[in-house]
Regions:
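Short secondary-structure boundary segments
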Residues: 413
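Metallocofactor- and cofactor-centric catalytic cores in central/energy metabolism, strongly enriched
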Residues: 1-408, 417-498
Length: 498
């Protein structure tokens, strides 16, 4: 199939996207370029007067800040955020046929969930115990892991919080939810939590739940004689935990036990054309098979939230509106604006406004009905396509999704990302083939073939779905092969540091 050289995403669009560099005077699909148009950037299909809507994906993505001639380059020099965004149209929810493949090889857990990995977590309750947790994990990986080959590793879960904060309120609650979500995560075959002893975030908050005591232990460094003594004590406790976790074996599990966290970072002009909508297809397939997918990054859906609200019941829709209102207030109090989200890298890649970025970001959610909206790191209580509130900062958002129960992460990128998490494997999807080639060490699948080779989005989405099940069954991701995940646990820090 011949690849297109200019793409029009919706018949209503007043702009098209150049799929390769376009020279001044060159004509494609009836549009003659008045100036050079870089690959991934937008060209005006029609003339637009100052103040007119600039339309992409069939939605307003901005307004002309000056008169724009047909064939002109449309970007931040002549396109700006509107005073308010218009809801020009909405997608309708679709009921997709369930895919043929509906199982994976995972670890059955006592509470009915299934893990895609079998790590042992070494968790810090406070930053003061983080270095000790790192030392424990390193020593356990050196001395214990060779004896217990059915364990994926000892993962340090360390952070910079846990003290110097109030013991109540949004920030404290978010931290406790996050740590409890990791404590109970299906990808952990056992957990050891280490405190210092005098911190605000006390170990008494983290009682064992469904894990028997043989799988879950805690202690404070101050109570065992110091740092080196803590490492020795931890290894004593970890030996029986590791022996028990080593008995865990992969067995066939239904896709309904998969929970996919969806992320995008380093987006470019192709992200909303290739990787994001293709991931949306995979999300729909997962949901149709009974699984769960999580969309997040509230600042990055700003301007496109109506597309989610249209797919939700009244209560869920109101939760989304409340989240947007909270973020407007939060950003304003901290001298920021949701309107200013696109990063320099986003803009270099062809994204102009937060509305344009948001419309592409929401495409990751496919067309399935929105089944619920959850607070950051809140435990999910249903399957289907759901929304979890979070910042747009990738490691913070992914940390919350994993705490909510995600046992897989799918991460789309156009400029390039090296992200990887533990204990949930992270699949990297490139929006363009150039990135897939240049950063092949970090990319798991090339979605650029949608434009480069004319591969239909439905087929690309099916490929992603199959890869998700392969990864869930034990195939290593690029980030796992390199060893990412020890420094990517980043709970959302809300409020004052005292």
């Amino acid at each position: 199939m011949k690849a297109p050289d200019l793409i029009i995403l919706d018949p209503q669009d007043t702009v098209a996207v150049a799929l390769t560099d376009m020279a001044a005077g060159e004509t494609r699909q009836g549009v003659r370029a008045l100036e050079p148009i870089a690959r991934g950037h937008k060209i005006a299909r029609v003339a637009m007067a100052k103040g007119a809507a600039v339309v992409k994906y069939g939605q307003m993505m901005g307004v002309a800040s000056t008169d724009i001639a047909a064939g002109a380059h449309v970007h931040s020099h002549n396109c700006a955020m509107p005073e308010g965004h218009a809801e020009m149209s909405t997608v309708s929810s679709a009921a997709l046929q369930a895919p043929a493949r509906q199982s994976f090889m995972g670890y059955a857990r006592p509470d009915g969930r299934a893990g895609t990995r079998n790590f042992i977590g070494i968790m810090a309750s406070v930053n003061c115990s983080s270095t000790v947790c790192d030392a424990i994990a390193a020593e356990a990986n050196r001395t214990l892991l060779p004896k217990y080959p059915n364990i994926d590793g000892f993962a340090p879960i360390v952070h910079d919080q846990g003290c110097g904060m109030a013991n109540q309120g949004e920030g404290f609650d978010a931290l406790v939810r996050t740590l409890k979500g990791y404590r109970d995560h299906a990808n952990f075959g056992g957990v050891l939590i280490i405190g210092l002893g005098c911190e605000v975030n006390q170990l008494t908050l983290y009682k064992p739940t469904d894990w028997a005591n043989e799988r879950f232990k805690t202690f404070n460094i101050q109570e065992v004689g110091g740092s080196r003594s803590a490492v020795r004590r931890a290894l004593e406790l970890l030996e029986p935990i590791a022996a028990k976790a080593n008995e865990d074996k992969r067995t066939e599990q239904p896709v309904s036990k998969l929970v996919l966290g969806m992320q995008c970072g380093g987006s470019d002009g192709f992200s909303g054309i290739t990787a994001n909508p293709a991931l949306g297809v995979a999300s729909d397939l997962l949901v149709a098979a009974g699984g769960t997918s999580i969309l997040s990054e509230t600042p990055e859906i700003f301007g496109a939230e109506h597309l989610l609200i249209a797919r939700a019941d009244e209560a869920t829709g109101q939760k989304i509106r409340d989240m947007i209102d909270w973020w407007r207030d939060y950003a304003g109090k901290n001298g920021a604006s949701l309107d200013n989200n696109p990063s320099p890298g986003n803009k270099k890649g062809g994204l102009t406004t937060i509305l344009e970025k948001s419309l592409g970001a929401v495409a990751k959610g496919g067309l399935s009905p929105l089944a619920g909206a959850f607070a950051y790191a809140e435990k999910l209580d249903r399957t289907g396509f759901v929304y979890m509130d979070s910042p747009g900062y990738d490691p913070v958002a992914a940390t919350g999704q994993v705490a909510s129960g995600a046992n897989l992460i799918a991460f789309t990128t156009g400029r390039g990302s090296c992200f990887g998490a533990k204990p949930a494997p992270s699949i990297k999807l490139a929006s363009n083939s150039e990135l897939a080639r240049s950063m092949h060490e970090d990319i798991d699948i090339d979605c650029g073939v949608v434009v480069g080779e004319g591969v239909p989005l439905a087929e690309m989405g099916a490929r992603i779905y199959d890869l998700l099940l392969d990864i869930a069954s034990g195939q290593k991701t690029a980030s796992e092969e390199f060893g990412y995940g020890d420094n990517e646990f980043v709970p959302w820090k809300i409020g004052a540091v005292l």
